[in-house]
Amino acid sequence: TFVHVTHDQEEAMTMADTIAVMNEGQIEQMGSPADLYDNPETAFVANFLGQSNLIKGTVSGNDGDNKIVDLFGQKISLRKDRSHAVDSSIYAGIRPEKFRISRLETATSGNILTGGKVEDVSYIGVSTQYQVLMPWGQELMVFEQNDDGVAPFSVGESVNISWEPSFTFGLRGDEDAEAGTEVNPDEDPDEE
């Protein structure tokens, strides 16, 4: 057993069996790399270990093992065992690579958010990154694999975003959605 301290998230994810994410000297969450990445318990952990789309919502009901969450008038499902919200105020979190982007007329399954508009397209070889402006004014990041033979979407194109409900994680709605994204200006991340 050994303890390795690093600020390199990729290094920690590939080397460790168990990771403790610390924030201001306190452990925010401890678990396997997959647990921390796929089901973070706080906005800090979600943002510190990669990019996250955190969408403010309200828990409006239950359906078996799922919570029903209202995201600006659009309903999605969230597994109860993936929710860390303590009341009806919630952030629904989805990683950019878990989203599927589609044209308005294309049928999709799972959770769906309609009425998006492509604001930016960055082709990076294996995938294309999209910034999609949603009707409530929030930009969502989508990483779409370039493996389906579909031509990339264009700036200005109207789209829907969908994903499997099991990919959603729920965070407390009173958290700072930007926690974990800032870099301390006094620290040089490349300094060893």
Where would I find each of the regions flagged by the language model?
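Conserved H-loop
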Residues: T1-V5, H7-T14, S32, A34-D35, P40-E41
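Conserved ABC ATPase "signature" C-loop
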Residues: E24-G25
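Short acidic-hydrophobic catalytic motif
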Residues: A34-D38, A46-L49
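Non-catalytic connector elements of ABC transporters
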Residues: S52, N62-E192
